[in-house]
Amino acid sequence: MKKQLLSILIICFLTQLIWAKKIIIKMATLAPEGTEWHGLLVDLGQNWKNATNGEIQLRIYPGGVVGDERDMIRKMRIGQIHGAAISNEGMTEINPYFTTFYMPMMYQSYKEVDFVRDKLSEELYSKTEENGFKILTMVDVGWVYWFSTEPLFTPEDLKTHKIFTWAGDYKSTQLYEKHGYQPVPLAMTDVLSAFQTGLVTSIGLNPMYVLAQQLFAIADNMLNMKWGNLTAAIIIDLKTWNKIDSQYQESMMAISKDLGDGFQAKNRYESDMAVGVMEEYGLKVNIPTSDQIDVWHQLIEDMSPDFRGTVINEKAFDRLMVIKKEMESH
């Protein structure tokens, strides 16, 4: 009897040791299940598990079930989740240099996106770590366009619309209001119902997300003009990261980078495919004239002083303007 009891105790002790080594990383994202961004996380989790002999396991919370991106950052800080796959909207809560990606019409080619990101690499990565988080991989998800319930071609047209802005981003809301626009702050998870009820009638968003959320059924007009570039990152809080064995950290970083590079190479051009699919189901792609595009550029030039210190952090804005001049001289 004593031998049996001893055997049971030994088995329980060994089982506890085995499970004690396992680290479960809870990671949230707004991306719905079945999207490419969600698929990247699934692949990431499987590869991490294989590379760490099952000691690191990724538990994914998709579709905004944890809340908006600001909610994700808050919950990471208090330990409810450990990681997130988020856009620059969430990253600006951690690192003000991500506000540089808010500059409208700054980027018109992926060459320009790569140029700016390369020049800002040190600030983007190091400042994030200084604030308690580690970037595992950083990619751009694609171009941002204006989607609306009625056609819009000019800034004056946009003034007739109720514009989605992120809940909590009061600086963008104030900036829009100052220049005569009608911003409506909401959580991204409430966008579909907001369009259905008429609370919102326009949004600047990436076509892949519009397709995934079926927003084009209501916001069935797209202005074919690159308004911005959606940058995203997969991050983990440093407290969790530092619990992981250093040899596994190296493998996990390599896996994250490889998967991120592969995702970007493929999905930089998925936006065009998403637009094509939506066109088959009634999306109207409205092409602005060169004169109309000039009006948009003039708007950005006029608003530029107001971006500094509001939507875009002062130091980040000044750094971006230096990079912009350098980029234009190439």
Task: Give the label of every model feature segment.
Residues 4-14:
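Sec-dependent N-terminal signal peptides
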Residues 5-7, 19, 165:
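Intrinsically disordered, low-complexity segments enriched in glycine/proline and serine/threonine
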Residues 21-112, 128-330:
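N-terminal secretory/targeting leader peptides
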Residues 111-125:
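A gly/proline- and charged-residue-enriched helix-loop-helix capping module
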